[in-house]
Design a protein with these regions (language model features):
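Short beta-strand scaffold positions
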Residues: 90, 159-160
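Short amphipathic alpha-helix
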Residues: 16-26
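Membrane-proximal helix-turn-helix segments that form the acceptor-binding/catalytic region
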Residues: 126-158, 166
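Acidic anion/phosphate-binding donor-loop and adjacent secondary structure
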Residues: 171, 178, 184-186
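Active-site donor-binding segments of glycosyltransferases and PAPS-dependent sulfotransferases
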Residues: 26-97
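Carbohydrate-associated surface elements
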Residues: 164, 183
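Nucleotide-activated donor-dependent transferases that construct or modify glycoconjugates
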Residues: 1-13, 35-36
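Active-site proximal beta-strand in glycosyltransferases
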Residues: 87-90, 101-130, 178
Length: 186
């Protein structure tokens, strides 16, 4: 069975990347698709994978300003072409679940959370900006929400990392999920 792993970005080893590391240990022959990465910051399991990055990888200094590129991320993840896979496993808190799966492939999304800055925590993320900037952000957030909802169509099975996330998936995506707690200390 050919397996593709997908993660939003891999530039450090935080909670989501530790889950991805556990998946890489289970599927050492998988290819990893990600928006951008920094191999030097990754675990040995992740460094051993074949890594395919989006065009965002080639922007100088991407690690320092990637949050400002959020409006481009849905396009970037859709630009990644999974060459051949029977199973796609996305580890997603942003746009990874929006990857195009090959015909006949099954897509499991291990959802760390529906994107907080889109669903319920906008004030936490954007209240510090002046009003004209917040209006511009609201314009993009509306489009990003639509993309986020549309990208759910390609997911065959949602796995939530907690009961709280399962409830958020049900509330915002109108999809059920099974709960599998992270297999790592986070």
């Amino acid at each position: 069975m050919k397996i593709a792993l997908v993660h939003d970005w891999t530039i450090h080893m935080r909670g989501g990347e530790k889950v991805l590391d556990a998946l890489a240990e289970l599927f050492p022959g998988a290819t990893l698709y990600t928006l951008f990465s920094d191999r030097k910051k990754l675990s040995p399991n992740l460094r051993r994978l074949r890594i395919k990055n989006s065009f965002l990888q080639y922007l100088p200094g991407i690690r320092h300003f990637y949050r400002w590129l959020l409006p481009l991320m849905p396009f970037a993840v859709r630009s990644l072409q999974i060459e051949d896979a029977d199973l796609v496993i996305s580890s997603s808190h942003c746009v990874a679940k929006g990857i195009r799966k090959p015909a006949g492939a099954f897509h499991i999304c291990y959802c760390h959370t529906p994107a907080r800055y889109l669903w319920g925590f906008e004030e936490t993320y954007f209240s510090r900006f002046i009003v004209p900037v917040r209006r511009l952000i609201a314009f993009f957030l509306d489009r990003l929400r639509r993309h986020d909802l549309e990208s759910n169509a390609g997911v065959d099975l949602f796995i939530a990392n907690s009961e709280c996330v399962r409830e958020r998936i049900l509330k915002f995506y109108k999809r059920d999920a099974i709960v599998i707690h992270p297999p790592v200390d986070i």
